[in-house]
Design a protein with these regions (language model features):
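Predominantly soluble domains enriched in secretory-pathway, periplasmic, or organellar proteins
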Residues: 1-212
């Protein structure tokens, strides 16, 4: 397929029940359960695509960085996506040497805001919608906390200042326990981090980890 394909799987058997073809290659994905909208980041095109989960029809598309790639210009690329079902908002990491997070209105498919200064290759993204907190991780070894009410960075914490190389690629939240599970593609471990102060609560031995 010159573009890409999104597969719908049976949650019990994992059999493919549907194939949604798209002219652009999808990478990151999320779903807004309230609107039944699938959101896909088209990394190589710096674009996000919205698809109706019921009909599989494309609802719309938004170019997030329209700069033309050259030897000196490298458009930011969408990586991870999370949807806030309570506000119909989609957050998308735009990775590069100076990364951003795009804030997209799910109803209009328009860019509402751009959160800048999220670090080098800030790939990881997780949302605590109830607390209005968005978290991202980056290749600078940081955990960055953002207030979704204002789209402002509240804090940035260097998780481990141990002289080793760290690239915190992804994270997943335990909102009840106020913990983040953070993968490190440079070290053989997954970190359990306290979201209140950014301290490391535990290290779980694992091969150089990517997703969590």
């Amino acid at each position: 397929d010159k573009g890409g394909v999104v597969y719908r799987l049976d949650p019990v058997t994992l059999e493919v029940t549907q194939a949604i073809h798209n002219d652009l290659k999808p990478f990151g994905a999320t779903i807004d359960n309230a609107t039944q909208t699938l959101w896909f980041g088209n990394t190589v095109n710096s674009t996000v695509t919205a698809i109706d989960a019921k009909t599989s029809e494309v609802k719309g598309r938004l170019v997030l960085d329209d700069r033309k790639r050259s030897d000196t210009v490298k458009p930011l690329q969408p990586r991870q996506l999370v949807a806030d079902d309570t506000t119909n908002t989609v957050y998308i990491t735009g990775i590069g040497k100076e990364s951003v997070i795009w804030v997209v209105d799910g109803a209009t498919l328009k860019l509402k805001d751009t959160i800048t200064n999220t670090g080098t290759f800030s790939t990881g993204l997780a949302l605590d919608a109830k607390a209005k907190r968005l978290y991202t991780t980056n290749a600078d070894g940081e955990l960055v906390t953002i207030d979704t009410a204002t789209n402002k960075i509240l804090s940035r914490k260097k998780v481990q200042d141990d002289g080793k190389e760290h690239f915190y690629l992804n994270l997943s939240l335990d909102t009840a326990g106020q913990r983040a599970f953070v993968t490190d593609s440079k070290q053989p471990e997954v970190l359990v981090v306290n979201l209140k102060d950014g301290s490391v609560m535990q290290k779980i031995a694992a091969p150089a980890s990517l997703a969590v």
